[in-house]
Amino acid sequence: MITAKKHPLDNCQLFVQLKKLFHDYNEKVQRLKDMIYWSGNDEHIAKICDQVTDLLVEHDLIIQPPDTMDPCAMNHLRGLLVYLVLNTAHDDIQCESQWSANVMHLCNQLPPIPLFLTIAIAVNCCLMEPLEEFLACGPRWLTIQYFEAFNEALSVINSDCVETLPLLSAALRAAGRAIVNCNLPAENKQLLRQIACMEHRHILDSKQRLHTLPRPSTRKIYLAKAMDHLIEVLLYTLNDPLKREKPNCFAVYSQITEDISDSNSSDPMPDLRHFAQILLDVLQRIFQLVSVDTYMYWHEMKSKSALYNCQELICRQTAELLKVLQSDKLLGEHPVCKQMQSFADAAKTLEQRVAEMRIGELLAFIDSGMATNEELLAGLDNLFSRFIAFGSDECLETMANHLIMLTKKHAQIILSFLGQVVESEMVVEDEGISVTEVNQGDDEDETSSNDDYEELLSLVLRPLFMQLNVEDKMEVLLLRDEQNVTQGFNFKAPDHRERRIRFFNQLDYNKRFPITEFLVLCFENARQTWIDFSHLGVTHTRFSKLFWHIAQSCPKHAAFHISACADNILVNEQLLQKPYALQFTLYLYGHRQILNGLYTSARQLCVSLKDGRCPYGEDELRQAQNRFLDACAYGLAKFIEPMNLPSLQLILKLLKQISLGESNLITRGTAELNALEKEHPKLENGDDAPAVKVAKHYTYLHASLPEWRLKHWKLISHVMKTIDALRWDLATFEDFRVDNLELAVWYWQDGLSHLTFLGTEFRQRILNQVSKLKHKDFWIIYLKEDTLKDTRSFLKLLTQSSAQEANDLFNKLLKKRADCAVMGDLSDAVVKVNSESAFMAFRFLFREYLIAFRSHAKHNKTITKRQHWDHLMAVVAKAPFSIRNEIMELASKAFAVRFGINIQEQQAAKC
């Protein structure tokens, strides 16, 4: 195993062994300084290269055939090349004075090596990549010597013109990058002359020179390879050259000398264009050598691309290069562009090429291991576009083997396909097939299983989702919600429930929220994950804030599942008794406004009247309201039967808070709209400003909320049933029950008490519902005025009333001057029942009587205070004897001081 070398120029065992190798060869075989020319020293050069290769193999830096074995090896190889360069005999006799202090420890370690030997070792011992880096990043006074030596040695290194093309391309690439990395205009001219010389010497760009190759087929192959390499160099050099940063290895080679300069000119493009023109001139001459026969021959030739034959590859490269050249005014005018046009017109894009393949060929291409990343991605994109692949084991295996190449886009393609599957399986009722509804109350039954695509989910979609970043995960979850895919497929891992429970048990609002883990749980079962999160929200204000913070970070996804949280909480007795349940459920009612965005004004959170992160229209807002009110209705229905008063009380308080909250929302919204209209005057054509239009849209929606709510029949009917069930008599009275009745009646009276003004159809629905209720008396009053004719009617209503209803009844009795008689009848009824609940009921009703009496006495100025007091005492005298003193005390505390009565004197007078 290779140990990474952080600092390439540090001394190491490899350098020590290399030093021994060169000294031994210098002393025992051949003195290196006597090797002046390559010619005649071929055998020595080969032996030295073999020994260096063996040394690199020993250190696992290369393997046979010679390739870089591990990315960690590169720093070792870079250091080795610099080590050789520092010990090479250069033409510049002052070069030793140029070395920096950072590399002096490596100098004079070896006998002086001929420059051509250094190049031979680089080419033959897997140091070609470091050599290219050195030529691109090293000091120009030094690298120009290597360009010259490379030019001289190239044909000697390999006499095969085709095989020298990759080496030539490496030198050309390095030259192009050198102009950008170290932009030295004077030195660039020398470099450009050297490049022109190198191309002229080593590229067969004339008919005469081309015919030095013995066979026509070889000539056709050479032309293809030459074009391929030249075009690649041009693309590499001209594709956004100024946007590419210097490579990390630049620092390695910049340490060699003290005087290396990054740039003496701010703009390398003039010299870069000159460099490109030199290559384009050669390319133009090669184009002229391409006959129709050669072009057709290329069609049968394999290329380095697994996707294209040689002809197709050259056409595609030509199209890419032409596009780059035409983006530059000067280079776009080069004559070769006209020659390239016909090739570019015949080019096939990657997408076109993979689309031509049969699915078996496409799989073979993707799995071949020969495709570039760009080609591989095009192949995978095409595979994902063939929906038949999602049901094929072979295709799924190929997808799974290339997960690293897959992105959010591929996950979205899968979900869109699954959405189509779900839609196709949902047949309308008139076709005689019904769709099974999902049991919303059962965690484990949220999704049904579709075995045909189980492997697509487990092998591809799930691991693909895991590797996406947080934002992409949120987008994928949203698309899945929009496609309604969870209704037809099971996304859960076997241990999902255990992990979900553990996640929320360990969640700490003081620590950073583990959003990635949360989104994975949402992928497996979003509905239940949000429900469990909401269970924490009702326990503590900080968990509530955390819930809404996370919901606002993925608002559109959260909007799909928050209604389910309300469905769950409002039928859960334990959750409704949590300390923050009322406030949290109220937020759930307004979740569309919260998710769209809130703002702070005067230290208060206010609803925004503009399109935020989760805009909504009438349909979305009404649907969210209906779902929540349905949940309230279900809660009332569940808790009224066992008379679960604490749970009923919270739901009824919630309904009251909703009514008050809507009123506040409308008031604030109107004020904000007025301010916006002042800030944004009407346009010249008389239209409202865009911001005002949007604000009016939201103001109208918010103003519609009470009307929609009061027309929600399911809730109305259950409120009526709740009121009916909470009605009491003298045997069943209890304060808590009456408190709940008061809340229920308040909600009814807040918007629906004036039934005589309701529409005929709605009024009839109310009447039909009333006919099914046990206690119809109050409903008859609401429906028909002047139905109270005698004291018996009043008594019947009083002994089942809420506080407000009792107060209203006593006001009517006081006006009729029948209060004393009714209180007497009430007292008789209480005595007859003779239970604690009956006496509690009398106390309750008497307190309400005192409230009504206070109002009566305040407004009736025709009677003196003493007369009022005497009337009150007459009513007190009707109280049951066992609690009369208590009733007297209540009356005295309420009115003795007000009427100027001295209770002690009055009691003494009686005595």
Curated annotation (Swiss-Prot):
Signal peptide: none annotated. GO terms for cellular component: SMN complex. It comes from the Eukaryota. Component of the core survival motor neuron (SMN) complex composed of Smn, Gem2, Gem3, rig/Gem5 and one of 3 almost identical Gem4 paralogs encoded by Glos/Gem4a, Gem4b or Gem4c. Interacts with Smn; the interaction is probably indirect. 'Gaulos' is the Phoenician word for a merchant boat. This name reflects the boat shaped expression pattern seen in stage 7-10 embryos. Disruption phenotype: RNAi-mediated knockdown is pupal to adult lethal while simultaneous RNAi-mediated knockdown of all 3 Gem4 paralogs (Glos/Gem4a, Gem4b and Gem4c) is larval lethal; this phenotype does not appear to be due to loss of snRNP biogenesis. Conditional RNAi-mediated knockdown in muscle cells or the central nervous system reduces adult viability and results in age-dependent progressive decline of the neuromuscular system; knockdown in muscle cells becomes fully adult lethal due to reduced motor function when combined with a hypomorphic Gem3 mutation. This is Gem-associated protein 4a. Transmembrane segments: none annotated. It comes from Drosophila melanogaster (Fruit fly). Component of the survival motor neuron (SMN) complex that catalyzes the assembly of small nuclear ribonucleoproteins (snRNPs), the building blocks of the spliceosome, and thereby plays an important role in the splicing of cellular pre-mRNAs. One of 3 almost identical paralogs (Glos/Gem4a, Gem4b and Gem4c), resulting from a genomic triplication, that have some redundant function. Required for neuromuscular function and organismal viability.
